[in-house]
């Protein structure tokens, strides 16, 4: 499957207009924003976990990073409330779910293969003083990339 896979082209997506698509796990639905591949894919997706839903244990060969948009995301490494940025590099594994339900914005298979930096952080705590009405936080920076978050 290829969806918005030509990264030389500008794409604007109204996520509220996208239908929720069921994942292979009951209670876990997604809105696909970009995708190259089938179930294991380079992808950017909004994922919704119904209360009490879980995904089976799996590894992230290409890494995973996500932002918890609402609710509390959980796995064996911790509980991550809304506003948390989580970075799981290649080779990490977990069993994700949510007792109360949650929605996350997730990017898969977009890491450098040598990246092994795993962490999570509260995005709001990282925000600097606003400039021209915009506050920005650097969530991750290394020789390969810089990940930022801006709040209006």
Pin down the residues of each PLM region.
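Conserved hydrophobic/aromatic beta-strand scaffold that supports enzyme active sites
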Residues: 30-32, 44-48, 65, 85-87, ...
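Glycine- and acidic-residue-biased ligand/ion/polar-headgroup-sensing regions
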Residues: 50-53, 60-75, 152
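Exposed loop/turn and edge beta-strand positions of beta-sandwich/beta-sheet ligand-binding modules
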Residues: 27, 43, 62, 67, ...
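A short hydrophobic beta-strand segment most commonly corresponding to one strand
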Residues: 65, 87, 100-116
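A short, N-terminal "cap"/entry segment at the start of jelly-roll beta-barrel domains
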Residues: 1-39, 106-149
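Short acidic-glycine-tyrosine-enriched beta hairpin
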Residues: 74-94
């Amino acid at each position: 499957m290829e969806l918005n896979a030509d990264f030389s082209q500008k794409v604007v997506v109204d996520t509220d207009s996208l239908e929720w698509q069921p994942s292979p796990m009951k209670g876990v639905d997604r809105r696909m924003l970009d995708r190259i591949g089938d179930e294991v894919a380079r992808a950017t997706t909004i994922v919704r976990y119904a209360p009490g839903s879980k995904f089976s244990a799996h590894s992230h060969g290409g890494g995973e990073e996500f932002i918890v948009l609402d609710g509390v995301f959980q796995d064996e490494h911790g509980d991550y409330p809304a506003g948390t940025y989580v970075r799981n590099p290649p080779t990490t594994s977990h069993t994700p779910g949510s007792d109360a339900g949650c929605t996350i914005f997730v990017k898969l298979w977009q890491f450098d293969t040598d990246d092994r930096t795993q962490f999570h952080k509260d995005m709001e705590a990282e925000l600097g003083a606003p400039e021209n009405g915009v506050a920005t936080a650097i969530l991750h920076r290394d020789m390969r990339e810089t990940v930022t978050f801006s709040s209006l």
